[in-house]
Amino acid sequence: VTQQRGSDPARNASRVAGEPDRLRVVLIQSSTRTGRFGPTVADWFARQLRRRDLQVDRLDLATAGLPDQLAGHDEPAPIAVRQFGDRLAAADAFVVVTPEYNRSFPAALKNAIDWFDTEWAAKPVTVVGYGTDCDGGHAATQLRQIFGELNAVPIRRTLTITKAWQRFAPNGSWPRRDPDLEAATTATVDQLLWWATALRTARTTTPFIP
């Protein structure tokens, strides 16, 4: 388990200069399998976030290089873990894009979560789940419990997308309009940003007590 990382120099420079400090959202792409559909869903949701003038930092577990075996408490973290953790620590909110496998989420995602601790704390998280006959709801429910244990704040709204392969074109665009999902997407982003703003203010004014 790693400790809280240092502050982000770019963010500090922005504050010193008095420039607006945009919220930073880390989007975690959790599928690592060959031929995965996850990048299509992640591309689409990243565009929804950027339309709200957010900084979006995408972390792909397929290329992150996180070791499968966790280090001991007294062992130094590998460089890939330190780099990943720095980006988590700089985030104001998290979005986890995940498929549902056998009523749960990929093992690579659990491994990524378990490498870290304080990096998640006092920050909101939502889940964008997808599948074929399933919609990612079981994965989202389990992730809410896990992130709550890590002192993150799982928000009420999540997105679950069934038959995702039929909803998206290969480039991530919509093959057809889906007013219900579009409305749910807007509401989810609205709620995530409310919590991100509120919790960033809280973290700035009052040290978090784990």
Predicted regions and their residues:
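N-terminal beta1-alpha1-beta2 submodule of the flavodoxin-like/Rossmannoid cofactor-binding fold
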Residues: 1-116, 174-186, 190-194, 199-210
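Short, glycine-/small-residue-rich phosphate/pyrophosphate-handling segment
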Residues: 121-168, 179-184
